[in-house]
Regions:
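N-terminal basic/disordered segments at the start of proteins
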Residues: 89, 93-111
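Short, solvent-exposed amphipathic alpha-helical segments in soluble enzyme
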Residues: 2-7, 31, 45-49, 70-73, ...
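Cofactor-cradling patches in redox/metallo enzymes
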Residues: 109, 119-211
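Ubiquitin system architectures
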Residues: 47-51, 56-93
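Short, well-ordered alpha-helical microsegments
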Residues: 38-39, 103-105, 169-174
Length: 222
């Protein structure tokens, strides 16, 4: 449309889902004017079902927290309403920043909502900082071990660690973290729980062969 009709981008197709009255099925709204409030779209679905944790604009991995009066923009594709956050009661928490998921600011925001005390911050060694401040994975899909980072979390006295890794990379966290007594949280947990989706922890199928990857088989709740 931008090329053929010389039409500016002022309409968006937006999906609203998760902790809503009437169930967690996806509600897709077509040709929504940019500037429409988040709250207006949520009300069109029937409203939020009781208590909730946060409203996220964007996807579970790279989205950000928003408010009911915030406007949708030309880059908005989804609005997600999460389950309430579990209360860590001030427990010491470590943050592992990966290029796959949220940046440090987003992870610290989630840690605050979990009521955890951030004690240690580590970065995946392949999440290299770029000139604009973002991070880019040097070798996507070929994940390094996270034993060193897990040891640093343990030495810092962390009870929990909050990760943002993809399902492949979370394997490397789960291979050693729980054995050290570290309790693993993923930055998407509050959103996955809202739709009954298994939590991202361990990839259970091989990446080496072609297969029909059923999400239910790829992750585990622990």
């Amino acid at each position: 449309e931008a090329i053929d009709e010389r039409k500016p981008s002022f309409l968006k197709n937006v999906t609203v889902r998760r902790k809503l009255n009437g169930g967690n099925e996806a509600h897709v709204f077509m040709d929504v004017p940019v500037g429409t409030s988040v709250g207006d779209l949520i009300e069109r679905t029937g409203g939020i079902d009781g208590e909730y944790g946060e409203i996220t604009m964007g996807g579970a991995f790279t989205g950000h927290a928003t408010t009911l009066d915030a406007p949708i923009t030309k880059t908005t594709g989804a609005i997600l309403v999460s389950m309430p956050f579990m209360d860590l009661k001030g427990a010491k928490l470590g943050i592992l920043v990966c290029a796959c998921g949220g940046n440090l600011e987003r992870m610290e925001d989630l840690a605050k909502k979990y009521n955890g005390t951030v004690t240690q911050v580590c970065y995946c060694k392949q999440a290299q900082e770029q000139k604009n401040g973002s991070r880019k994975c040097e070798r996507p899909g070929i994940c390094p071990g996270q034993v060193k980072n897990n040891l640093d979390f343990k030495k810092a006295g962390c009870e929990y660690i909050l990760i943002g890794n993809c399902s492949d990379c979370s394997n490397t966290v789960m291979a050693s973290g729980p054995k050290m007594g570290l309790k693993v949280l993923h930055m998407t947990d509050h959103l996955m729980r809202a739709v009954g989706h298994p939590l991202y922890r361990t990839l259970r199928v091989s990446k080496e062969v072609d297969q029909d990857l059923n999400v239910q088989d790829n992750v585990e709740n622990n």
